From Swiss-Prot:
This is Tubulin beta-1 chain. SMART domains: Tubulin (SM00864), Tubulin_C (SM00865). Keywords: Cytoplasm, Cytoskeleton, GTP-binding, Magnesium, Metal-binding, Microtubule, Nucleotide-binding. The keyword Lipoprotein does not apply. One of its GO terms (cellular component) is cytoplasm. Its main location: cytoplasm. Expressed primarily in touch receptor neurons. It holds the Pfam family Tubulin. GTP binds at residues 11, 69, 138, 142-144, 204, 226. The gene is mec-7. Gene3D superfamilies: Helix hairpin bin, Tubulin/FtsZ, C-terminal domain, Tubulin/FtsZ, GTPase domain.
């Protein structure tokens, strides 16, 4: 029933991915060996969305783990949930992509991609009614970005009518791991625009800010950041995994969230975000949740929704709460902030409610916004890209793997087109008076 095949590529993708499996295994009562140790039928009712039942009472994730070097894989395998995954589903090379998109997409990655597709095919064949794929990766490195996008386009060829969903970690403005991030990210976005149905943009810097300001962690680790990401991922998929009063699946989400096919880059948010020490001191209410999840401080992408307008948004509430109250609050927030929503899409906020809250919380909300403000993120990458590309800095690493400069130019202009499309719809709302006058003639 509506299965999802999960793929994690590259170091970042594997770290986020394995955290995600820890979180949802916990929610479904699956222990690190794959045995069910839960206490509620609800945990098993839709367990087959993400897990395969291998034998009596043993559940195996429908996950494919991909990397071009063995390092991260080894640490996943020796990590707490390493024995959960099917050993054949670890697919790795030995050479590494060295943060080079061309290696991931054209040379090293292309050699490994058929092995990966075999495993993906095997997973897809064991499903009843495949809903789609989700990929976790980063856009700044070599494997996640280069090989990740290669996998997407190959899977797209084979399963054109299935939803393709990515959780993409976008290079952040202040925190940079490698110099060539702008190149890798631009080349990746060029692919994502064409080949995915929904992309959740996650940004390390925004995550750092949340950890630092809201969660009061003085020195956040990648573990802390990944925990936030996995909370969001668990929230986005919660409707698929648990029964609820108002359910959504990946396709419903796409239909409601994507007004124009290219504009499918979402900003996730999560509430309640309270520091660990503060958690037990406050009961959270539906109005607070709604307020918090539209708050710019809770966004996981480093752009400010107040600088743009929401084309569409979705909120997924978890926990026992009154539907009536949820609807009232959602309406309330739209009325109060009506200037931040485009007026040419009426009722552009979708709500879903699921009865089962995440561990340790009475209720929570996950927010997904399709805001024109996301262009800030692409603009930033594009500026850095242009600065380097104008001088042809570092290009030899890419041309040496057989890439052409033309491809860079195309990717650059595709990204700039994307920015101006967002801008166009942001302004489409701004001059409706002129449009009304025009209609009135």
């Amino acid at each position: 029933m509506r299965e999802i095949v999960h793929i994690q590529a590259g170091q970042c993708g594997n770290q986020i991915g394995s955290k995600f499996w820890e979180v949802i295994s916990d929610e479904h009562g699956i222990d690190p060996t794959g045995q069910y140790v839960g206490d509620s039928d609800l945990q098993l009712e839709r367990i087959n969305v993400y897990y395969n039942e291998a034998g009596s009472n043993k559940y195996v994730p429908r996950a494919v783990l991909v990397d071009l070097e063995p390092g991260t894989m080894d640490s996943v395998r020796s990590g707490p949930f390493g024995q959960l995954f099917r050993p054949d589903n670890y697919v790795f090379g030995q050479s590494g992509a060295g943060n080079n998109w061309a290696k991931g997409h054209y040379t090293e990655g292309a050699e490994l991609v058929d092995n990966v597709l075999d495993v993906v095919r095997k997973e897809a064949e064991s499903t009843d009614c495949l809903q789609g794929f989700q990929l976790t990766h980063s856009l700044g490195g070599g494997t996640g970005s280069g090989m990740g996008t290669l996998l997407i386009s190959k899977i797209r060829e084979e399963y054109p009518d299935r939803i393709m969903n990515t959780f993409s970690v976008v290079p952040s403005p202040k925190v940079s791991d490698t110099v060539v991030e702008p190149y890798n990210a631009t080349l990746s976005v060029h692919q994502l625009v064409e080949n995915t149905d929904e992309t959740f943009c996650i940004d390390n810097e925004a995550l750092y800010d949340i950890c630092f300001r809201t969660l009061k962690l003085t020195t956040p680790t990648y573990g802390d950041l990944n925990h936030l990401v996995s909370a969001t991922m668990s929230g986005v998929t919660t409707c698929l995994r648990f029964p609820g009063q108002l359910n959504a699946d990946l396709r419903k989400l796409a239909v409601n969230m994507v007004p124009f096919p290219r504009l499918h880059f979402f900003m996730p948010g999560f509430a309640p975000l309270t520091s660990r020490s503060n958690q037990q001191y406050r009961a959270i209410t539906v109005p607070e949740l709604t307020q918090q999840c539209f708050d710019a401080k809770n966004m996981m992408a480093a752009c400010d929704p107040r600088h743009g307008r929401y084309l569409t948004a979705a909120a997924i509430f978890r926990g026992r709460m009154s539907m009536k109250e949820v609807d009232e609050q959602m309406l309330n927030i739209q009325n109060k902030n009506s200037s931040y929503f485009v007026d040419w899409i009426p009722n552009n906020v979708k709500t879903a409610v699921c009865d089962i809250p995440p561990r340790g919380l009475k209720m929570s909300a996950t927010f997904i916004g399709n805001s024109t403000a996301i262009q800030e993120l692409f603009k930033r990458i594009s500026e850095q890209f242009t600065a380097m590309f104008r001088r042809k800095a570092f290009l030899h690493w890419y041309t040496g793997e057989g890439m052409d400069e033309m491809e860079f130019t195309e990717a650059e202009s595709n990204m700039n087109d994307l920015v101006s499309e967002y801008q166009q719809y942001q302004e489409a709302a701004a001059d409706e008076d002129a449009a009304e006058a025009f209609d009135g003639e």
